[in-house]
């Protein structure tokens, strides 16, 4: 897995005929048109929980609204100056129904950096507290968390984002892209990425390749049965290779942490608003 600073280096290697590399799916640029590798343009506002995380007007990552004041994303998307855009379909222009919030707290999972497996993006999950709650509308909705730790391999799920639609060459779409991909078994996932997969991860993709999340999609949702089953984390570069599925953070492993973290911060704010007792 390459950190952001080395994404360009791995891109250069791939263009010159080098072997595939593992890469986090984070990007700091935005561009023209296309679709998620092997995917299609989402029907506008059909993914109302989808968030876009921008820094100085440039796409960094995706995210997912899990509470009117909280967005879930990948821990490796941590960066100063994040702004969260919700109710978006097309980036680069103001749209009716969109809402924008600054981030007041970024809370990566406490084991993300401390864990011996952190170099493999173990515990790659982060909560973002928004400056104020968003208003839920037809364009903006929360997505329920999955409590199911093991869905059947082969289950079709949907991943979405504004990441590059081609790989290794890059092409960033103006509109939100979707791809329907299948869950892979834990055994297959560990065979593909020996020594790198933990119980906190899952794999999804297609045998034939061509459908995948890619750079710029990090932190976005993998939706299975209308619940948040995974968070885009990392995978091989170039994206969409046959038998090289993308790797996602397994959300069901973190439901308790998500709920306790939100409850903790909400309680602290209530105490502050009440003042000294």
Curated annotation (Swiss-Prot):
EC numbers for this chain: 3.4.21.-
Keywords: Disulfide bond, Glycoprotein, Hydrolase, Protease, Secreted, Serine protease, Signal
Keyword tRNA-binding: no
One example GO MF annotation: serine-type endopeptidase activity
Family annotation (InterPro entries): Peptidase_S1_PA (IPR009003), Peptidase_S1_PA_chymotrypsin (IPR043504), Peptidase_S1A (IPR001314), Trypsin_dom (IPR001254), TRYPSIN_HIS (IPR018114), TRYPSIN_SER (IPR033116)
Disulfide bonds: 42-178, 61-77, 157-224, 189-203, 214-239
Tissues expressed in: Expressed in prostate, breast, testis and salivary gland.
Gene Ontology terms: cellular component: cytoplasm; extracellular region; extracellular space; secretory granule
Record SUPFAM superfamilies: Trypsin-like serine proteases
Primary location group: secreted
Residues bearing glycans: 30, 225
Catalytic site positions: 76 (charge relay system), 124 (charge relay system), 218 (charge relay system)
Signal peptide boundaries: 1-16
Xref: Gene3D superfamilies: Trypsin-like serine proteases (2.40.10.10)
Compartments, record wording: Secreted
Residue span, Peptidase S1 domain: 36-263
One Pfam family cited in the UniProt record for this chain: Trypsin
Any GO BP: protein processing
Highest taxon in the source lineage: Eukaryota
SMART domains in the cross-refs: Tryp_SPc (SM00020)
Stated family: Belongs to the peptidase S1 family. Kallikrein subfamily.
PANTHER family in the record: KALLIKREIN-13, KALLIKREIN-RELATED
Protein name as annotated: Kallikrein-13
Taxonomic source organism: Homo sapiens
């Amino acid at each position: 897995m390459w950190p952001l600073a080395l994404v360009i280096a791995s891109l250069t290697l791939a263009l010159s005929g080098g072997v595939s590399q593992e890469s986090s799916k984070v990007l700091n640029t935005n561009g023209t048109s296309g679709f998620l590798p092997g995917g299609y343009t989402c029907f506008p506002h059909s993914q109302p929980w989808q968030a876009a995380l921008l820094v100085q007007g440039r796409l960094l990552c995706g995210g997912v609204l899990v509470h009117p004041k909280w967005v879930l994303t990948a821990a490796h998307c941590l960066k100063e100056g994040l702004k969260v855009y919700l109710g978006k379909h097309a980036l680069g222009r103001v749209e009716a129904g969109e809402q924008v919030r600054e981030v007041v707290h970024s809370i990566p999972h406490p084991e993300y950096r401390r864990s011996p497996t952190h170099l493999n993006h173990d515990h790659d999950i982060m909560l973002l507290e928004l400056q104020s709650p968003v208003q839920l509308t037809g364009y903006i909705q929360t997505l329920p968390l999955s409590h199911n730790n093991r869905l059947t391999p082969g289950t079709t799920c949907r991943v979405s984002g504004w990441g590059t639609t081609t790989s290794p060459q890059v092409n960033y779409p103006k509109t939100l892209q979707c791809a329907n991909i299948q869950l892979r078994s834990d055994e297959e996932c560990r065979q593909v990425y020996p020594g790198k997969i933990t119980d906190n991860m899952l794999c999804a993709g297609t045998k034939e390749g061509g459908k995948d999340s890619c750079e710029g999609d990090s932190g976005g949702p993998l939706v299975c049965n209308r619940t948040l089953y995974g968070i885009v984390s990392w995978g091989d570069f170039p994206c969409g290779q046959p038998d090289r599925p993308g790797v996602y953070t397994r959300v069901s492993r973190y439901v308790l942490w998500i709920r306790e973290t939100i409850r903790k911060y909400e309680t602290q704010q209530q105490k502050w608003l009440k003042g000294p007792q």
